[in-house]
Amino acid sequence: MIDSELSLRWMRNYSGDSLLLHEQEFYRYWLRYYNENFEARFGLQKIVFGTSQLLRTLSWFDSIDPMDPIGQTSGVKALRLRWFPMHNLSSWNWIIASKDDTLSYGGRIEFSNTIGEWGFTYHTDPSKSIKSISSINTSVLGSDSRFAIDYRFDGLIGLWNESALIQSNRSKVVTMTLGADYTLPISTGLLLTVEYMSMQNQFDYATRDSKFLALMASIPLGITHQIMMVSQMNIGEEKLYHFLRWSSTYNYYSLNFICTIYPKRSSYQYHDQFLHQSLAGFGTGLQVMFIYNH
């Protein structure tokens, strides 16, 4: 069978009278052929894999944020092939076009057995530009090769791990995420998720170690409402980030009330040129988001 998608995104974000973001671009355009054992997709698409939800070691080609009610992610211009030779085995291959007109390529194998679900991923990128990888915005200098393994076990408690090595001619990044989730029998079920990330970034003659901890709790209230809370901590810098959202979802629209408590702007030990000029994203914030689906 053959299908396709074409969609546009137009976005303007304001903070007071300051324009923070203005985007008007294609969001997706792709053509796909698929059958029971094979899928080929070509065009601007999303490529997402891995088991983590908050501290995502394998966020190589996407910008998914679990705190974003829209759930959109940036795409890549790529040819992606997937094979399904067995019900518990799949193979991915891709070629991605970068913004500086170079081609990167890679692949992934996924399989499951009695002790869990496994994934093995490889990718190489010859681009010489500085690249930002994962939800923590790790910087990689120069062309690089990436190796990763991820695992998930679903039992009484869900457990998962993502581990990756990103090696370039100027830097070496080793990242690991450990996570677990459990549903408490409270009301309709309180889902608790905790993740820990350890990251070591070696570039030139310097080494930087970072550690992060994240906790997410969510509970549905009937079939319409849901409350979600996320707290993250940068352990080395002792900074806390808190997020609370009440969502109400109806047939054609949803309403989201969001409260954030982030460190104040004055607590960051960075030059002003590395911080955006608006106060949005610092201190305490309140947001109301209306989403219409048609």
Predicted features along the sequence, with ranges:
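Transmembrane beta-barrel strands of outer-membrane/channel proteins
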Residues: 4-10, 42-44, 94-98, 120-124, ...
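Outer membrane beta-barrel transmembrane domains
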Residues: 120-127, 133-135, 195, 200-249
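Outer membrane beta-barrel
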Residues: 1-90, 111-112, 264
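Signature for the C-terminal beta-barrel architecture of outer-membrane proteins
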Residues: 1-2, 34-37, 66-207
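Outer-membrane beta-barrel "beta-signal"
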Residues: 81, 248, 253-261, 278-294
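Outer-membrane beta-barrel translocator domains and adjoining extracellular loop/strand segments
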Residues: 14-22, 53-59, 103-106, 130-138, ...
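Gram-negative outer-membrane beta-barrel proteins
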Residues: 10-16, 48-52, 87, 100-102, ...
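Hydrophobic, lipid-facing positions within transmembrane beta-strands of outer-membrane proteins
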Residues: 24-29, 75-79, 103-107, 145-149, ...
